[in-house]
């Protein structure tokens, strides 16, 4: 969260599921239901939208030192198989398009974090 804050990154792209074929693939680094504090940053989950091929989560991230806050949006692509590639690239292209559309819509100045 500190890296996102320092680089003014308000969009995170995640390309894996948490578990696949019974194995952990990624640690859940975000709070699911209640706010959590990570050093100086309080992360409040605001919303979660499940789409056909991805999940969009929105968080309010507050710097506890000065009270400033930002909205961070996490896009998790869920249609990528553990082995190989998706049957069609269309869903992934749509996903990337939505990420860029969101960046333009909300005027993010910092980089997209992957």
Curated annotation (Swiss-Prot):
Residues 1-114 form the Tyrosine-protein phosphatase domain. Keywords: Hydrolase, Protein phosphatase. The keyword Endoplasmic reticulum does not apply. Signal peptide: none annotated. Its EC number is 3.1.3.48. It holds the Pfam family Y_phosphatase. The keyword Hydrolase applies. GO terms for molecular function: protein tyrosine phosphatase activity. It catalyses: O-phospho-L-tyrosyl-[protein] + H2O = L-tyrosyl-[protein] + phosphate. PROSITE patterns: TYR_PHOSPHATASE_PTP. InterPro entries: Prot-tyrosine_phosphatase-like (IPR029021), Protein-Tyr_Phosphatase (IPR050348), PTP_cat (IPR000242). SUPFAM superfamilies: (Phosphotyrosine protein) phosphatases II. Substrate binds at residue 82. SMART domains: PTPc. Belongs to the protein-tyrosine phosphatase family. This is Tyrosine-protein phosphatase 13. The gene is STY-13.
């Amino acid at each position: 969260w500190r890296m996102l804050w320092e680089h003014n990154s308000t969009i995170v792209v995640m390309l894996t599921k948490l578990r696949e074929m019974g194995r952990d693939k990624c640690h859940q680094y975000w709070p699911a239901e209640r706010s959590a504090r990570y050093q100086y940053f309080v992360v409040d989950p605001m919303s979660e939208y499940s789409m056909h091929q991805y999940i969009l989560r929105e968080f309010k991230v507050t710097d506890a030192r000065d009270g400033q806050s930002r909205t961070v949006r996490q896009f998790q692509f869920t249609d990528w198989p553990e082995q190989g590639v998706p049957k069609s690239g269309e869903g992934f292209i749509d996903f990337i398009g939505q990420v860029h559309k969101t960046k333009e819509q909300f005027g993010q100045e910092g980089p997209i974090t992957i």
